[in-house]
Design a protein with these regions (language model features):
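Signal peptide-proximal N-terminal region
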Residues: 26, 54-80
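Short, low-complexity disordered leader/linker segments with a strong preference
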Residues: 1-35, 66-70, 99
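Structural motif
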Residues: 74-99, 155-158
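Short, solvent-exposed amphipathic alpha-helices that sit
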Residues: 49-65, 89, 128, 155-158
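Extracytoplasmic "Venus flytrap"
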Residues: 30, 37-58, 81-87, 109-112
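Extracytoplasmic ligand/sensor domains, especially the bilobed periplasmic-binding protein
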Residues: 102-158
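Second-shell loop/turn segments in exported
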Residues: 42-48, 80-83, 103-104, 143-150
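Sec-exported extracytoplasmic/periplasmic mature domains
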Residues: 58, 62-66, 95-103, 119-126
Length: 158
């Protein structure tokens, strides 16, 4: 339940961040869309955990499929990239989301993939919010990666 609440809060934070920015090139259709990238493993060692986070994100999106910004309604669409629970493959997944032009990113389950993908989001100036990446290095030196969970030192010493 706590993880679901964290994911819901994460989605609210993303929507709030999006409200602060402007879309330079709106879609050519009448429907305005905000695309949120989901940077989660659906395969590999952390695939099961990533799938649970995806379910939480999808649930939050089903509850809040639109957001009103400046009096205009925007549809929130999700697009996915499987980082395969592998820090050597996470940069490719991050680049996929950047190339899709996402407005913000949610994820990932597993700190090593967040650390590996984070520089790509930072370079593209895309805010990313991790719900379970607890390693302090995820956000250190990256002004675009945030987290809604505690960090490893808070959990206790080894």
């Amino acid at each position: 339940m706590k993880k679901l609440i964290a994911i819901l809060l994460c989605l609210v934070m993303v929507v709030s961040m999006v409200a602060c920015g402007g879309e330079k090139n709106p879609p050519p259709t009448d429907e305005k869309v905000i695309t949120i990238g989901v940077f989660e493993p659906t395969s590999g060692q952390n695939g099961a955990g990533g799938k649970k986070e995806i379910l939480g994100i999808q649930y939050a999106n089903s509850l809040y499929p639109t957001v009103t910004i400046g009096g205009e309604e925007y549809k929130i669409e999700l697009t996915y990239a499987d980082n395969q629970s592998d820090s050597s493959k996470a940069p490719t997944a991050a680049q996929q989301l950047v190339s899709k032009g996402v407005t913000a990113v949610l994820g990932t389950y597993g700190s090593s993939c967040a650390i590996a993908g984070g520089p790509y989001f930072e370079q593209a100036k895309i805010p990313a919010i991790g719900t379970s990446c607890t390693n302090p290095q995820v956000t250190q030196g990256n002004d675009y990666y945030f987290r809604v969970c505690f960090i490893d030192p808070f959990q206790g010493e080894k």
